[in-house]
Amino acid sequence: MTAEPQDQGFPAFYSEAPTIKLRDPLAQFLGAARHGVIEYRYTDVVRLSGHSCPTVAGAYLMALHGLRALYGTEMPVRGDVEVFMRDAPGSGVTGVISSVAQLVTGAAGETGFPGAGQLALFARKNLLVFGADVDGVLGMRRRDTGKAVTVHFDNAVVPWPGEMRPLMTKAFADQANSAELERFAQLWQERVRSMLVEYADNPALVWVSDWQPAP
């Protein structure tokens, strides 16, 4: 029996976040998952990142909506999508976002899986690109059809409550007491909850546009 998120110390709302189900041909080929089907949950990206924040939640939702736009009612194919990050890997939170995108899509940079055998089957290497000419946070392109989209994100539509600003200032300066730190953490996760539960399908938070990348 699978433990619920709160049983592992996670906030209960993590289980309310949308899930992302894909088929991974490599997982099927190697017998890692029945029919290659893998379902990702928000808890997976929290484990990957080691934390939960608006950026991690936004990256998860961008991957979700990007794949929905590319595949429609089809099940997305992990490892068959290229991801194009607008900024350099060391710029701001680009590294955090790209890590989440890599987990979900399988697209990797130069350290990715080079492929199986002489035919390099199921290769994921160099499917993740930085510094791309993208009008959005990131772009995604199907390798089989060439269909491409850009994905945009604006977390300003889910603002911090007024109470948070002084708490954040004290917490980041390592000057908050235990009660203030507890409240800070509650408000921090409440914003994440709003994004994942109340705004998950709100096009003001995450929206997708068709894209025609340069050859």
Predicted regions and their residues:
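Non-transmembrane, aqueous-exposed alpha-helical and coiled segments at domain scale
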Residues: M1-S52, L61-P215
